[in-house]
Amino acid sequence: MSKNFGVDSSQIDTLLEKLRLASGIKGKAMLDTYVQFAARYLINSDAQELAQLDFEELTADVEQAWSFVQERKTSRPLVRLDQSERRELGRATPITTLRVLLDDKPFIVDSLRQALLRHGAAIMEVRNTVLFCGRRKAGSKAEGYGRFGQLAALSNSVDDDFSVEAFCSISC
């Protein structure tokens, strides 16, 4: 199911199965899309970083990221800041996560990261991926996909019906 980039494949497969069971998503097709998204979102993560995260915190992060990519109405970038807490050594540390979804552009993650660093942000983790998204506008026919609307499917490669979108999540 997974390739080994930053995370051991058995580690990511175990996490994906736990996420599948915890998701509460109805319908096999959408559940499979959710697991595919989670795999793409987590695959470049540092193995030690993932091992240290509490499963509930990781689940919340994946759920927030999944919720964020659900609808894209225009070609303008989507940007959102999420606030949360991370528990470390018995104390809560506030976390701000910048999430950005836009048409795929080279070096976008590095540009965002550098801008945050220039403004004094202490970056804790960066997760980014390229998504091949099949979207449908409300009320549109069931066959075929477009660039905008509700996320209906993900692909593993470029396809004429799927838009290429860059998604990144930077926690400070």
Outline where the language-model segments fall.
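A generic structural motif
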Residues: 156, 163-172
